[in-house]
Amino acid sequence: MTDKVRNRVQCWPALAQESSCVDFIPARQGATCGSTVVFIPCCGLTRGRRVLCQWFPCLSGGCCSQESSCVDFIPARQGATCGSTVVFIPCCGLTRGRRVLCQWFPCLSGGCCSQHTVNIIGEPPRPVGAPSFEFVEFGRLPSILSTELKLFQRAPVPEDFGIYYEGNADIARQRWTGGEAKALELLGRRLKQEEEAFREGYYLPTQARPDFLAPPSSMSAALRFGCLSVRMFYWCVHDLFARVQANNQLKHPGGHHITGQLIWREYFYTMSVHNPHYAVMELNPICLNIPWYEAKDDSLDRWKEGRTGFPLIDAAMRQLMAEGWLHHILRNITATFLTRGGLWISWEAGVQHFLKYLLDADWSVCAGNWMWVSSSAFEKLLDSSSCTSPVALARRLDPKGEYVKRYLPELEKFPALYVHEPWKAPPELQEQYGCVIGKDYPAPMVNLAEVNKCNANKMNAIRQKLLDQGGSTPAHCRPSDMDEVRQFFWLPEDVAAES
């Protein structure tokens, strides 16, 4: 480090007062080898830039070609943490220097991470108490007015609005009941599940140990329709964690990650504000314009109807139609298969299908998840190399094929050896099991190994084109690291390796 640079760092006490996510300001537009890049923690970029301009006239439009050419970063103080002032001087391009810098600032490896944002914003308010209706008098409309307004004399059902059931009632196992009373009852069961997990030293039990056969314990539908306060759910889980820690003298790390999915929910809400094109690709400022395949055959219909020839995918899609529900992991694997991990069909088609049939469908959250899964947004780097194989995932999470057989009764006689790859069963056994592949159940519609390789090449070409043009993914918050991605996708090392 030169004395010149060291002295300059000591002249920035004002910058140490800034807070919030870390950003960088290049010494000039199109900064190249040898230019200065100043990393500052900026709550308001305008103020940060104004302060910097007092020390760097080049930021106001001048040129800073005389700066040192060494590759280095200088923290404003020793032991700098996320949010510290850093001077970054690349001589070999931003990539190498950024890699060095990320050792100090993990959030920079994928943009400003949501966990860091949450730490700055602080805890959400606690829920207010239930209102009292003791002295409230409710009026009643005259019957003639009720008739004139065409009010329902009972709670309406979907059929009253011309919406009719399209699934297979014979395989439907889960019926949902709305209302606050049922939501609080489900919350009580969910908290017992959370408590068991905390005692055993883990969290997010529905993801850490997913059970596709058990009754859903997710609170998403109750949150979606306002039957349960999201603040109540958040604080119930965190207060429970604190009690378990204290009562059992445990020292497991806590923090916002124990309710990580709620954080992503709020984050997707934030990203959709003032963006009417959030659920489509065109005119969406945070979405990459990927040239997806325009399906003119029946590929999209086969995916929707559960006729892809891959049992886990088909079972999930039929469960969706029958029950209006899918486990988070199944949503990800079916979405991946439709987009970058299989059919290369636009995520927009998937969003519309999920919004129509998912009971807990939420425009902001649903579209946000689809953009992420398809690598269209919220990605550190366009990638199709880590697509989980539906066959490998099925073997791990449904080893006996019980889930698959529940929603694909045509495969109920297939043993565990063949149930996830029924096309591998010898023809005579298929006859014996009463299900001939290609006749009673479809053969795989694609060769997974081939399409994964092809799709990975497409993504790599798109990424390289962006880099060649000096571009990058749209500016938005992304996962901090691979651990956060794995937690979101439930992507174990061994499953990824088999992909």
From Swiss-Prot:
A Pfam family: FAD_binding_7
Major localisation: cytoplasm
GO molecular function: blue light photoreceptor activity; DNA binding; FAD binding; flavin adenine dinucleotide binding
InterPro entries: Crypto/Photolyase_FAD-like_sf, Cryptochr/Photolyase_FAD-bd, Cryptochrome/DNA_photolyase_1, DNA_photolyase_1_CS_C
GO biological process: circadian regulation of gene expression; entrainment of circadian clock by photoperiod; negative regulation of DNA-templated transcription; nucleobase-containing compound metabolic process; regulation of circadian rhythm; response to stress
Keyword list, A-Z: Biological rhythms, Chromophore, Cytoplasm, FAD, Flavoprotein, Nucleotide-binding, Nucleus, Photoreceptor protein, Receptor, Repressor, Sensory transduction, Transcription, Transcription regulation
Protein origin, superkingdom: Eukaryota
Annotated compartments: Cytoplasm; Cytoplasm, Perinuclear region; Nucleus
Annotated positions binding FAD: R190, S218, S220, Q261, H328, D360, A361, D362, C366, N369
Cytoplasm as UniProt keyword: yes
Functional description taken from the UniProt entry: Blue light-dependent regulator that is the input of the circadian feedback loop. Has no photolyase activity for cyclobutane pyrimidine dimers or 6-4 photoproducts. Regulation of expression by light suggests a role in photoreception for locomotor activity rhythms. Functions, together with per, as a transcriptional repressor required for the oscillation of peripheral circadian clocks and for the correct specification of clock cells. Genes directly activated by the transcription factors Clock (Clk) and cycle (cyc) are repressed by cry.
Domains: entry comment: DNA photolyase domain is sufficient for light detection and phototransduction. FAD-binding region regulates cry stability, cry-tim interaction, and circadian photosensitivity.
Subunit relationships: Interacts with tim and per; promoted by light conditions.
Name of the protein this chain belongs to: Cryptochrome-1
Organismal lineage: Eukaryota, Metazoa, Ecdysozoa, Arthropoda, Hexapoda
Gene encoding the protein: cry
